[in-house]
């Protein structure tokens, strides 16, 4: 991990420190940073819960202990950094108290683990008491609900912050294989030579989850799969898979290339999209009985530029599918049917598969000859085995935010472009197709790939059933 050069933060202020994200992710990431001696500032929590610092420390330990074996010395160092302010974040008087607690800190990082509707009010209140002059502000997705709301949110943030002060957190951008994509593509000539329309015939991106909306019914019913994962996670991954090489190492160099991809994509065609909903979804607490919210979405898109013109890209994501897996699959073009080949029949196309979750890794599928038939051979690499223990996404993102490294965060123009791309599907969502839990989604999704390779069974870790 690199220092972004903007100066390290001397205070971390977490709005919503008693919330679900802090319990599941943030405290664990802070603990791991402390363990690796990468945490070097006080932590001030802000939330509406009336609790003491001692109660916050106890709650933090319980949160970390859910997934980590706690080293008392490490935790004691982390606990010593914690302080707490309780109050209503919409009350301007809270920010006077906050200013007193911040004191002489000159480069705070404000991490807003709050509902998106509170982002702008919090930032505007911070500006009113002059707490933003050298600060950075991290905001969690979703960044808006549609194109219009994203434009409004960005305008309100930019009225009091420079773009270099805003960190838009999408945890997918902190995942090891997503970070590695740039290096895999451009540092390996064997891959770089194949990575265009001349060698690749189509691209599939799958994000499957083997669970439902659980206790998030009310939230999810207002969002759906398109907003929840496609507009952000999967389009960001698509950009990294297809972008041109950056001309330098800065965050803007990387984000410029991602933005070029988005600009080359037309708004999605509702006729090339299939929406699904698993049976039983409307029985979940918080979900409307007549809900037409999608828990599954599959779509086709293309990138109209020199490298990718004519290459179809298929994206699917859904809940209550047979397995939990996220992967990118690239199909290479077939070799011709030549006389020496078995039965003069060409082999199946080679495939390059990048598994993002779980057990990140890379697979090259090639063909071999056995007797008078073809056989697929899989050349597999596990990043955990070959590269060592991965840095967890929130650990990576928190550290990047603290040192001012913007490479792992989404930029304003990319957010607006991705909303532009999906907006037609929000305006004209179309029919909802029901599907059984444990299936790979509605049958109608197969029609998107007519004349192409069809949805493939994902590459699952050894011993995983689907």
Swiss-Prot record:
Entry GO CC: cytosol
GO terms, biological process: glucose metabolic process; pentose-phosphate shunt, oxidative branch
Active-site residues, Swiss-Prot/TrEMBL: 233
Reaction catalyzed: D-glucose 6-phosphate + NADP(+) = 6-phospho-D-glucono-1,5-lactone + NADPH + H(+)
EC number(s) stated in the UniProt entry for this protein: 1.1.1.49
Positions contributing to substrate binding: 171, 175, 209, 228, 319, 324
GO MF, one annotated term: NADP binding
The protein's annotated pathway: Carbohydrate degradation; pentose phosphate pathway; D-ribulose 5-phosphate from D-glucose 6-phosphate (oxidative stage): step 1/3
PROSITE patterns associated with the record: G6P_DEHYDROGENASE
Binding site for NADP(+): 48, 88-89, 141
HAMAP family: G6PD
Family: Belongs to the glucose-6-phosphate dehydrogenase family.
PANTHER family to which the protein is assigned, alphabetical: GLUCOSE-6-PHOSPHATE 1-DEHYDROGENASE, GLUCOSE-6-PHOSPHATE 1-DEHYDROGENASE G6PD
Purpose: Catalyzes the oxidation of glucose 6-phosphate to 6-phosphogluconolactone.
Protein name (Swiss-Prot/TrEMBL): Glucose-6-phosphate 1-dehydrogenase 1
